Amino acid sequence: MYHYAIFGGIVLIVFGIDPGYAIVCWGAIAFQNNSYRAIGYGSVETEAHTDFNARLEYIYDELTAILSRCRPDALSIERLYFQTNQKTAIKVAQARGVTLLAAQKLKIPIFEYTPLQVKTAVTGYGKAKKPQVMEMMRRLLKLEEMPKPDDTADALAIAICHAQAAGSALRRVLYDRGTHYQ
């Protein structure tokens, strides 16, 4: 599931996270020569009637195992923004915290992006709706079907957002050094 080939150029492996506490969706992509390929995607789901601390531990353990297998160059995660439900926001923030801890313990660099940044990166429109984001993920990653659960497409989009930002930064560094990069 986490195999990729290097055919020349620089390969960047990015792991995207759409945080939650009932379900944490993830997506791993390879970015090379301005093209993307899905390496894997899925979700970590917790039982609703389980002790909340046990749910956090489960999220941490599962993501640590997945990240250890995938070995990404970077983890990108959506920056939280809640307007109404503070109780939900706090629980999602706690789940997000154990996600960040898993990456930090594995020494994976962490990058945050707003939903506006992610939507703009993948659709060109910061107010795109979920079906538009999902369709762009299917097209950009050449997937035969839509990723399930739906929030998995968001995790893949978050990964692509970082790959674009990192690719631009890498091109600038290589250009400054006089190194050719395609």
Q: Can you describe what each PLM-predicted range is?
A:
Residues 2-182:
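Phosphate- and other anionic-substrate recognition elements at nucleic-acid/protein interfaces
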